[in-house]
């Protein structure tokens, strides 16, 4: 594996984040603790996203620093998370009575991403096997309840936020897990997500391919979640070898470069939404929130692929 070694501010900031956040054992305990309880029942929130986000970033950081203390902390956290997995593979911050609403699948997406990223760096054969099996069982529990057929819920109806694009964004780790563990049901589930169009009542993937609209003209303009769906579509296009969907991602990104890039590097100048930011960045109206950091990071990740 090739590694880049930076100097100056890039290296300093990576090591600062590692020292101050990623080596904070109390923080890891806090984000893992959420899965031993059901805190998101109260408001259908997204407390379950933090473990996976933190794990993904920490694994990427470890690939740069190769810090053994950090690796040990990540190993401890993964083992703790696995104790929260239920008999059927489910890992969630929602109870069974409240599951598959709000941000439940979104949170489970990040659990899956966190497990996949740790699996990539895991040096212990037995733990690596356990982590992969946990990821498989976690996804299997979702596929059992989401999709077509009696007793299943359509993925775009598994959330009342943003026409379900937050749920559809699980496409990325579904495909990534298929690339590690090529089970037919994982690719079929990815097919299902794409065929459903990402959003309830609107096919974001086909709209991007047809290239008639800017993303701020879509009926759903939540920037972070939209881009996350297209990250997944790019992995899907790679696995399926479908130029149609690769072009859809390229056209989507080109439209964003034209209409949403701002001088400070983010996008989405109205709340956390696409709003023709390239133009509106000079506006004088401010609703108290703009240029969500998650949007900036996801934009960087999408372009890096």
Where are the regions a protein language model picked out?
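Glycan-recognition and catalytic cores of secretory/periplasmic carbohydrate-active enzymes
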Residues: 1-305
């Amino acid at each position: 594996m090739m590694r880049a070694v930076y100097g100056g501010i890039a290296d300093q900031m990576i090591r600062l984040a590692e020292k101050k956040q990623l080596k904070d054992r109390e923080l890891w305990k806090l984000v893992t603790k959420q899965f031993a309880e059901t805190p998101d029942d109260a408001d259908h929130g997204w407390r379950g996203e933090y473990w996976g986000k933190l794990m993904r970033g920490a694994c990427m950081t470890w690939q740069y620093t190769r810090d053994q203390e950090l690796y040990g902390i990540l190993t401890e956290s993964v083992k703790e998370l696995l104790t929260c997995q239920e008999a059927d593979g489910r890992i969630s911050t929602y109870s069974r009575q409240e599951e598959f609403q709000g941000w439940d699948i979104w949170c489970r997406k990040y659990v899956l991403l966190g497990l996949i990223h740790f699996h990539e760096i895991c040096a212990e054969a037995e733990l690596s096997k356990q982590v992969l099996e946990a990821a498989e069982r976690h996804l299997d529990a979702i596929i059992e309840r989401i999709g077509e057929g009696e007793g299943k819920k359509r993925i775009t109806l598994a959330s009342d936020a943003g026409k379900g694009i937050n749920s559809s964004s699980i496409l990325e780790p579904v495909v990534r897990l298929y690339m590690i563990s090529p089970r037919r049901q994982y690719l079929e589930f990815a097919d299902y997500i794409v065929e459903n169009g990402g959003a309830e009542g609107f096919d974001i993937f086909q709209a991007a391919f047809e290239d008639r609209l800017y993303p701020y003209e879509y009926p759903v303009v939540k920037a972070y979640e939209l881009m996350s769906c297209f990250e997944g579509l790019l992995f899907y296009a790679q696995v399926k070898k479908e130029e149609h969907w690769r072009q859809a991602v390229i056209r989507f990104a080109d439209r964003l470069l034209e209409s949403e890039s701002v001088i400070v590097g983010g996008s989405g100048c109205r709340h956390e939404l696409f709003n023709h930011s390239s133009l509106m960045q000079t506006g004088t109206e401010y609703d108290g929130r703009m240029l969500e950091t998650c949007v900036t990071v996801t934009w960087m990740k999408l372009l890096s692929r």
